[in-house]
């Protein structure tokens, strides 16, 4: 079956999903969560095959962590689907209304986008998360995962499709692309008359390929080169907590810190504290000349290090003379994802917030809060770094659009 045929079937199924009631979607998502629990053993066995193949290829620890499933993570995925089930249904919400002088009633109403192509790497949980969010928002979803997770993704998709069948919803509403050739993905990205939106999540190469070749609208979930700037006025204990949480708790996450910027006035006090805490957590440090003047034992940082999304226990450090230099560094090397300032200076905090165009800006809070669940969205399909209708963590509302609904009593314009 061609990718175009699969997409057409998904579009037809999406029409069915778009008309499901909030109660029906709630029940469907609960059933999808139960299906994952029922099929957990088969899913974990499939994941073990993917992990074995990945280790044989010499895959790094960060990627293995993204790929791996266990009982705890499976329970978390099922729980996440139940959380999505409990979220308010955005479809049909009226976001604005007014009665015009001629008596017509003008409303803006949320409606599903249609068919969403999710293109991603490594993370099998995205298969379930994306399916749940898209269906809750009334959409069909085409899932194109990476070859490294093909067995896991297939097992998860089969379980979820079983729940769709039981609910008399066409299983094409959740379509998994099993042909992983690059040409097939390219063909999918050309189907702008069928697919309404493509969301790539993964490495820089994948996202660039999708952005450069798609005729379908694309919301990029670009790499997370996230910074922490420790200002001269910062509470050093607070800054250290932000640094440890942002770098050492889950370095493979896109909201983990990759670069530390330290004001020169506090470098000699803060850097030794930071180095000791990070060494205890096996973090490799790389710094500029000013950093190495305080920490001579660490490796020098290259220009490439400051633009890198390490996704590992590696941190680039630079000492800066002032806030303006920190802002300039972030603008040059950042990826518009998440930036953090540790400061007790309210004016500097406000300047930091206003001067950066990043999707999420934190003041005295960990970069790890750059997450849909943590920010009150309930769940996210990813973190958009594209300045379109959704910027930053994308929840259910980002998977809908607003259209005008006009109600009248026979009014005409002329």
Curated annotation (Swiss-Prot):
InterPro entries on file: Ald_DH/histidinol_DH, Ald_DH_C, Ald_DH_N, Aldehyde_DH_dom, G-glutamylP_reductase_CS, Glu-5-SA_DH, GPR_dom
Top-level taxonomic group: Bacteria
Catalytic activity entry: L-glutamate 5-semialdehyde + phosphate + NADP(+) = L-glutamyl 5-phosphate + NADPH + H(+)
Subcellular location: Cytoplasm
Keyword match Membrane: no
Signal sequence range: none
GO molecular function, one term: NADP binding
Lineage: Bacteria, Pseudomonadati, Pseudomonadota, Gammaproteobacteria, Lysobacterales
HAMAP family referenced in this protein's UniProt entry, alphabetically: ProA
Major enzyme class: oxidoreductase
Keywords: Amino-acid biosynthesis, Cytoplasm, NADP, Oxidoreductase, Proline biosynthesis
EC number: 1.2.1.41
Protein role: Catalyzes the NADPH-dependent reduction of L-glutamate 5-phosphate into L-glutamate 5-semialdehyde and phosphate. The product spontaneously undergoes cyclization to form 1-pyrroline-5-carboxylate.
GO cellular component, one term: cytoplasm
UniProt record similarity statement: Belongs to the gamma-glutamyl phosphate reductase family.
Protein name as annotated: Gamma-glutamyl phosphate reductase
Main location: cytoplasm
GO biological process: L-proline biosynthetic process
Family annotation (PROSITE patterns): PROA (PS01223)
The protein's annotated pathway: Amino-acid biosynthesis; L-proline biosynthesis; L-glutamate 5-semialdehyde from L-glutamate: step 2/2
Coiled coil: none
Pfam families in alphabetical order: Aldedh
């Amino acid at each position: 079956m061609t990718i175009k045929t699969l997409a057409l079937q998904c579009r037809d199924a999406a029409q069915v999903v778009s008309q499901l009631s909030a109660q029906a979607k709630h029940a469907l998502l609960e059933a999808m969560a139960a299906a994952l629990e029922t099929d957990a053993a088969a899913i974990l066995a499939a994941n073990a095959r993917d992990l074995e193949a990945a280790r044989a290829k010499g895959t790094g620890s960060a990627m293995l962590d993204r790929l791996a499933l266990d009982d705890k993570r499976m329970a978390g995925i099922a729980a996440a689907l139940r959380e999505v089930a409990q979220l308010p249904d955005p479809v049909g919400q009226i976001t604005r209304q007014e009665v015009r002088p001629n008596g017509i009633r003008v409303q803006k109403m949320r409606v599903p986008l249609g068919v969403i192509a999710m293109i991603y790497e490594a993370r099998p949980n995205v298969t379930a998360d994306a399916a749940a969010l898209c269906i809750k928002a009334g959409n069909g979803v085409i899932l194109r995962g990476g070859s490294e997770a093909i067995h896991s993704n297939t097992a998860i998709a089969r379980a979820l499709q079983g729940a769709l069948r039981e609910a008399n919803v066409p299983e094409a509403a959740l379509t998994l692309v099993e042909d992983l050739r690059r040409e097939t993905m390219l063909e999918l990205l050309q189907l702008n008359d069928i697919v309404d939106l493509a969301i790539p999540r993964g490495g820089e190469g994948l996202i660039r390929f999708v952005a450069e070749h798609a005729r379908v609208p694309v919301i990029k979930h670009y790499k997370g080169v996230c910074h922490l700037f420790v200002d001269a006025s910062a509470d050093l204990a607070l800054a250290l907590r932000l640094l440890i949480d942002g770098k050492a708790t889950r370095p493979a996450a896109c909201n983990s810190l990759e670069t530390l910027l330290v004001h020169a006035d506090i470098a000699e006090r803060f850097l030794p504290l930071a180095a000791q805490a990070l060494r205890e957590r096996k973090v490799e440090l790389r710094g500029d000349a000013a950093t190495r003047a305080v920490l001579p034992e660490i490796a020098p940082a290259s220009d490439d290090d400051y633009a890198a999304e390490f996704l590992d226990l590696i941190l680039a450090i630079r000492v800066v003379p002032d806030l303006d230099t920190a802002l300039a560094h972030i603008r040059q090397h950042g990826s518009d994802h998440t930036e953090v300032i540790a400061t007790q200076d309210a004016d500097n905090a406000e300047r930091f917030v206003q001067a950066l165009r990043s999707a999420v800006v934190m003041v005295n809070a960990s970069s790890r809060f750059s997450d849909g669940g943590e920010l009150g969205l309930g769940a996210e399909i990813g973190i958009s770094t594209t300045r379109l209708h959704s910027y930053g963590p994308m929840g259910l509302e980002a998977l809908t659009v607003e259209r005008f609904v006009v109600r009248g009593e026979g009014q005409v314009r002329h």
